[in-house]
From Swiss-Prot:
Pfam families: RRM_1
Gene Ontology molecular function: any one: RNA cap binding
Annotated protein name in UniProt: Nuclear cap-binding protein subunit 2
GO cellular component terms, semicolon-separated: nuclear cap binding complex; nucleus
Lineage per the UniProt record: Eukaryota, Metazoa, Ecdysozoa, Arthropoda, Hexapoda
Keyword Cell cycle among record annotations: no
Residues annotated as signal peptide: none
Cellular location(s): Nucleus
SUPFAM superfamilies: RNA-binding domain, RBD
Family the entry assigns: Belongs to the RRM NCBP2 family.
Native organism: Aedes aegypti (Yellowfever mosquito)
Length: 159
């Protein structure tokens, strides 16, 4: 009799659009992984702060900070890799939606860190979600990059 591992913490609808492999393979890896994607971090949150919070759920293999691909400075996300899936499930259950550095962090399953994914995918080097942000968010560098460069209005007029 074969059994299918079903996570006790449900998978979200988010999928990495740059995943190298089939949708089926990505789903399989997400159900087995002990790696988490952590989003909505302040640009000033340190690896030590992340370690202090996430180590409450278990032993951490490594933390990979998300970096602006041009400046090599933190850009609001990271990957936390645990030794055990159960510890990652605890972090999903108990840390997702809590505050770190006065921000509500988003914790999601990740199919496994691959070199290069630590860099932001936005045109300006950071995260895509920060490119077009029109609100002023001090913890994420102020206004979105397009607003800072005065391009948002021009882009909207051209549409």
């Amino acid at each position: 009799m074969t059994s299918v591992h079903t996570p006790s913490v449900a998978l979200s609808k988010y999928r990495d659009q740059h995943f190298k492999g089939s949708r089926h393979e990505q789903e399989r890896l997400l159900r087995l992984t002990s790696t988490l994607y952590i989003g909505n971090l302040s640009f000033y949150t340190t690896e030590e702060q992340i370690h202090e919070l996430f180590s409450r759920c278990g032993d951490i293999r490594r933390i990979v900070m998300g970096l602006d691909k041009f400046k090599k400075t933190p850009c609001g996300f990271c990957f936390v890799e645990y030794y055990a899936r159960d510890d990652a499930e605890s972090a999903m259950r108990y840390i997702n939606g809590t505050r770190l550095d006065d921000r509500i962090v988003r914790v999601d399953w990740d199919a496994g860190f691959v070199e290069g994914r630590q860099y932001g995918r936005g045109k300006s080097g950071g995260q895509v979600r920060d490119e077009y942000r029109q609100d002023h968010d001090l913890g994420r560098g102020g206004y979105g990059k397009m607003v800072q460069m005065g391009q948002l209005g021009a882009n909207m007029r051209d549409s």
